[in-house]
């Protein structure tokens, strides 16, 4: 039964080639793996949280996974299909810095109004701390989610209006690599964003 759908149709492959940084072979391999883990072709938030928890065994990744799921689920239907999954994976793993920052911005912008408020930033940072704080030693000025959020806003909110625009977010991250580390909660950078 699973055999009949284990290859992407040519028109789907072409669409994904145009919207990702993956080769045809990589797309086919990812698709096979996706169908193996998600035989229905759709991933629910609970399934996604279980998968995400495997990557963060020493913390509670469920809240952060919900935010990542929401950002992957671009059509807001409550599931992630292969196209949504592979496009987001391409951006987060192979995208240029600006693409990654736009993706991260959309995750932090919880209400989708085009700005990140302090409370939105705090909610994401709290979720990150729940996920990794048991295995990461934080500097004193970042020892709580509130301190980290304040630090990010001090550095990024250049017009002091209490919210971050996409432009402030990208400019702040590009001008100071430590901001990217603050956002990622990953001192070695690169991997998670």
From Swiss-Prot:
GO terms for molecular function: calcium ion binding. CDD domains: EFh. Ca(2+) 1 binds at residues 73, 75, 77, 79, 84. Ca(2+) 3 binds at residues 157, 159, 161, 163, 168. It is a lipid-anchor. Ca(2+) 2 binds at residues 109, 111, 113, 115, 120. Pfam families: EF-hand_7. InterPro entries: EF-hand-dom_pair, EF_Hand_1_Ca_BS, EF_hand_dom, Recoverin. In neuronal cells, but not as specifically as VILIP-1 or VILIP-2. GO terms for biological process: liver development; regulation of signal transduction. Residues 41-58, 60-95, 96-131, 144-179 form the EF-hand domain. One of its GO terms (cellular component) is membrane. The keyword Glycosyltransferase does not apply. A lipid is attached at residue 2 (N-myristoyl glycine). Keywords: Calcium, Lipoprotein, Membrane, Metal-binding, Myristate, Repeat. SUPFAM superfamilies: EF-hand. It is found in: Membrane. Belongs to the recoverin family. Probably binds two or three calcium ions. May be involved in the calcium-dependent regulation of rhodopsin phosphorylation. This is Hippocalcin-like protein 1.
């Amino acid at each position: 039964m699973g055999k009949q759908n284990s290859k992407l149709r040519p028109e789907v492959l072409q669409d994904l080639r145009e919207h990702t940084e993956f080769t045809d072979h990589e797309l086919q391999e990812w698709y096979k793996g996706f169908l193996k883990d998600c035989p229905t072709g759709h991933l629910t938030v609970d399934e996604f949280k279980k998968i995400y928890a495997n990557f963060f065994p020493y913390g509670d990744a469920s809240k952060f996974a919900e935010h990542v799921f929401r950002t992957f689920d671009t059509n807001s239907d409550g599931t992630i299909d292969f196209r949504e999954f592979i496009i987001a994976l391409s951006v987060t793993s192979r995208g240029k810095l600006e693409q990654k920052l736009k993706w991260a911005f959309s995750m932090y912008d919880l209400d989708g109004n085009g700005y990140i408020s302090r409370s939105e930033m705090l909610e994401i940072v709290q979720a990150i701390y729940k996920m990794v704080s048991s295995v990461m030693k934080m500097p004193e000025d970042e020892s709580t989610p509130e301190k980290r959020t304040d630090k990010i806003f001090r550095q990024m909110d250049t017009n002091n209006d209490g919210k971050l625009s996409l432009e402030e977010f990208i400019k702040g991250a590009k001008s100071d690599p430590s901001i990217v580390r603050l956002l990622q909660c990953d001192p070695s950078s690169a991997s998670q964003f």
